[in-house]
């Protein structure tokens, strides 16, 4: 269990982290997500022992790592660290990179290297290759194997997939998840990629301006964010004014269900694009609302539609939808809402 209590950090008089409270107990994979400058990498460096907090206490499995000026050195914390670029030693071969820091006889080290190469699914013939002779995805697997060599209690991943192209990023992320699960090592991933955080973790922590804004399961954060800022940060969204009465909300899209039917009065509600079905009016005659397409931005799998809602004065909305039909400007469409809209707390 990792615990942070009242942790703060400043650099040159500028506060980077402020009064951080965080407990990671049951979660095996945690993602800390936030925009650039939110303090997430600094938080990771404090946990790793590369920096010392100005105030606060950090403990791991009951051991105090830092408190009131006292700090356990990074190499004694049993914490693995994989940086963004892998940081492999260019003058060492793959096997020597993985074995770096291992104690024991040459045979014992080689046995451990063989085990780790198999664990991260790297062929044995790469052991004598130099880092520049293998792909970016393979380099990240070597960095992970090197971090696992010391049998850490916790693995820290500092945006390790950001330098990879899209297809390789997803494949490498899945491979890393599988390896960490097989090794039974808890992990914390720092990323600015919302989709990466939601798909990697079973607990997500959102950071904004040096503070923790919200934490919970990926599903809860995506569907029930605490604020409009978090809602828009975590994915495409449609936020509307609404009036709740009788357990339902009257809004631009008609009368729809909400996740807080006990709320009353004027509120702000949120829908995700996948909750809204868009169909040609010739296909269906039943819908909450009708609209005219004003603009279409096609980008392959997804199209962004600008819609003018009928019976509403100058109300125009933008929606992303799967490009299952060839939408055209001027087309009349019907809109229907699936599931409940999320009601923001006032």
UniProtKB/Swiss-Prot annotation:
Reactions that this protein is recorded to catalyse: Fe(3+)(out) + ATP + H2O = Fe(3+)(in) + ADP + phosphate + H(+)
InterPro entries to which the protein is assigned, alphabetical: AAA+_ATPase, ABC_SmlMolc_Importer, ABC_transporter-like_ATP-bd, ABC_transporter-like_CS, ABC_transpr_FbpC, Mo/tungstate-bd_C_term_dom, P-loop_NTPase, Transp-assoc_OB_typ2
Bilayer topology annotation: Peripheral membrane protein
Alphabetized SUPFAM superfamilies for the sequence: MOP-like (SSF50331), P-loop containing nucleoside triphosphate hydrolases (SSF52540)
Domain ABC transporter: 2-234
SMART domains: AAA
Protein location: Cell inner membrane
One Gene Ontology MF term: ABC-type ferric iron transporter activity
GO cellular component: ATP-binding cassette (ABC) transporter complex
Family, similarity comment: Belongs to the ABC transporter superfamily. Fe(3+) ion importer (TC 3.A.1.10) family.
Record's function text: Part of the ABC transporter complex FbpABC involved in Fe(3+) ions import. Responsible for energy coupling to the transport system.
Quaternary context: The complex is composed of two ATP-binding proteins (FbpC), two transmembrane proteins (FbpB) and a solute-binding protein (FbpA).
Protein name in the entry: Fe(3+) ions import ATP-binding protein FbpC 2
Organism whose genome encodes this protein: Pectobacterium atrosepticum (strain SCRI 1043 / ATCC BAA-672) (Erwinia carotovora subsp. atroseptica)
């Amino acid at each position: 269990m990792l615990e942070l209590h009242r942790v703060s950090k400043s650099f040159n008089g500028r506060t980077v982290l402020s009064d951080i409270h965080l407990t990671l107990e049951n979660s095996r994979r945690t993602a800390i997500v936030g925009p650039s400058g939110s303090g997430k990498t600094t938080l990771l460096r404090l946990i790793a022992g590369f920096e010392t907090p100005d105030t606060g206490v950090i403990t791991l499995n009951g051991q105090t790592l830092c408190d009131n000026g006292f700090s356990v050195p990074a190499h004694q914390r049993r914490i693995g660290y994989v940086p963004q670029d892998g940081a492999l030693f260019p003058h060492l071969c793959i096997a020597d990179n993985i074995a770096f820091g291992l104690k024991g006889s040459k045979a014992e080290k080689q046995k451990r290297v063989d085990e780790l190469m198999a664990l991260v699914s790297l062929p044995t013939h790469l052991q004598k290759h130099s880092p520049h002779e293998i792909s970016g995805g393979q380099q990240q697997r070597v960095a992970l194997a090197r971090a696992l060599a010391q049998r850490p209690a916790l693995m820290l991943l500092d945006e390790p997939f950001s330098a990879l192209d899209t297809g390789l990023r997803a494949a490498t992320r899945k491979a890393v998840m599988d390896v960490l699960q097989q090794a039974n090592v808890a992990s914390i991933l720092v990323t600015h990629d919302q989709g990466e955080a939601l798909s990697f973790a079973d607990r997500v922590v959102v950071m904004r301006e040096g503070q923790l804004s919200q934490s919970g399961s990926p599903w809860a954060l995506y569907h029930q964010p605490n604020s409009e800022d978090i809602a828009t940060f975590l994915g495409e969204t449609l936020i509307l004014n609404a009036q709740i009465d009788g357990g339902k909300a009257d809004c631009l899209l008609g009368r729809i269900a909400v996740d807080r039917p006990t709320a009353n009065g004027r509120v702000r509600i949120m829908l995700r694009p996948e909750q809204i079905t868009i169909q040609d009016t010739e296909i269906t005659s039943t819908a909450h609302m009708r609209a005219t397409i004003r603009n279409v931005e096609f980008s392959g799998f997804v199209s962004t539609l600008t819609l003018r809602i009928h019976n509403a004065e100058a109300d125009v909305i933008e929606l992303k939808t799967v490009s299952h039909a060839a939408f055209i400007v001027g087309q009349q469409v019907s809109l229907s809402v699936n599931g409940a809209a999320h009601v923001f707390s006032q």
